[in-house]
Amino acid sequence: MTRIADLRRDYRRQRLLESDAAEDPIEQFRLWLTDAVNAELPEPNAMTLATVGLDGMPAARLVLLKEVDDRGFVFFTNYRSRKGRELAAHPKAALVFWWAELERQVRIEGNVEQISAAESDAYFQSRPLGSRWGAWASQQSEVLASYAELEARLAAVEAHYGENVPRPEHWGGYRVLPTLIEFWQGRPNRLHDRLCYRRQGDHWQRVRLYP
């Protein structure tokens, strides 16, 4: 078996220069996300979401980005889940996107708000029928005695709602309002390119960071 310490890769794909980067980090993010989609990477909108636990410990998991606009980055979940409870207590989060084939990472920090009920309703109704049933059947993050119990709950939801499934009040979207966005491009000898944007009032300040 290969020693973990011997696993390494040298990055040589391209540079990230100030002259090539957008002044607005949201615009720059859209450009990089488009590159990831066009490269047909698996789950290009997958991101690590880190929250502050109720006990002060950090918690992280993968979720899917579902919208990005000038305000921030939107994802959806059960408000009663662990992350939902953590965001209610500490409405701050960090996101990380990793596109290995492009040798790129984006790191985001910011405050978090729930999106409007109308926005959550619109997205919920766009989901596949099975996913809408699942939002009612799953008591996310609670202890499950057996998978059969979940199947029984799903069958009950199907029988009750059929194809007319409303959005549960405990399910909806969050928007991460970024205060920091950092773009990382892998380079040889671990001398990576890092451009960091920090929110300063109504504009962004961009600096280059040591790798």
Curated annotation (Swiss-Prot):
Spell out the family assignment given in the record's similarity comment.
Belongs to the pyridoxamine 5'-phosphate oxidase family.
From the broadest rank down, the organism's phylogenetic lineage runs: Bacteria, Bacillati, Cyanobacteriota, Cyanophyceae, Acaryochloridales
Q: State where substrate binds.
A: R8, R9, D10, Y11, K66, Y123, R127, S131, R190, L191, H192
Q: Which gene encodes it?
A: pdxH
Question: Which is a GO BP term held by this UniProt record?
Answer: pyridoxine biosynthetic process
- Give the multimer and partner information: Homodimer.
Q: What is this protein called?
A: Pyridoxine/pyridoxamine 5'-phosphate oxidase
What does it do? Catalyzes the oxidation of either pyridoxine 5'-phosphate (PNP) or pyridoxamine 5'-phosphate (PMP) into pyridoxal 5'-phosphate (PLP).
| PROSITE patterns recorded | PYRIDOX_OXIDASE
* Keyword terms, alphabetized: Flavoprotein, FMN, Oxidoreductase, Pyridoxine biosynthesis
Q: Which cofactor does it need?
A: FMN
Q: What is its EC number?
A: 1.4.3.5
The free-text note explaining how the cofactor binds reads: Binds 1 FMN per subunit.
Q: Which PANTHER family match?
A: PYRIDOXINE-5'-PHOSPHATE OXIDASE, PYRIDOXINE-5-PHOSPHATE OXIDASE
UniProt source species: Thermosynechococcus vestitus (strain NIES-2133 / IAM M-273 / BP-1)
Annotated catalysed reactions: pyridoxamine 5'-phosphate + O2 + H2O = pyridoxal 5'-phosphate + H2O2 + NH4(+); pyridoxine 5'-phosphate + O2 = pyridoxal 5'-phosphate + H2O2
Q: Which GO MF terms are attached to this record?
A: FMN binding; pyridoxamine phosphate oxidase activity
Question: Entry's NCBIfam families?
Answer: pdxH, PRK05679.1
